[in-house]
Amino acid sequence: MEKDPFKEYLRESEPDKAHKGYAWSTAIGLQAVDGLKPSKYLIDTAIQNIEGKITMKEAQTLIDSYYEERPVHLSDDERTEEADKVSSRIAEILSETAFSFSPNEYISIHRKLFQGIYKHAGKIRDYNITKKEWVLDGATVMYGSASELRATLEYDFSQEKDFSYKGLLLYVCHKHKATVRLRDIYVEYS
């Protein structure tokens, strides 16, 4: 019998407990940056996943079912639903090892995070935006021009791909990372 040429390729599996804890903590923390707070239900579901009682897919199914069974009418509850769904999606993305550093991946991640929450999830906006950020004490963030977003994305990704971190001191790496402009581009905001 001939050797299976695909045997060396292993199907990605659930990460270990520590990595799951990191993924959920990061996901919830990223929501807090936008002033969103997850529900107790999400926290309990995340703990079940971290402890290995349910898979990441099962956690997402539980979160989705939870909101299908109890339609939301209040704006605070809508934001909690967003926090829960996006947190579970961030945790899933952080648990995956597959990744391509490209504009298409960036847009795809946006679509995965906000699908079913914002109608323009994963689409490059065709209008200019501004937003006052509480993390900047109310200062307005300057976002890229809608007419140039695709070109700006491609340029920024190429610049980052060409940058070498080899041999740099940690503070220089942090300084460079602080100048990466992807958040300024902001694919879509509803």
Task: Give short role names for the model-derived ranges.
Residues 1-189:
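FIC/Doc superfamily catalytic core
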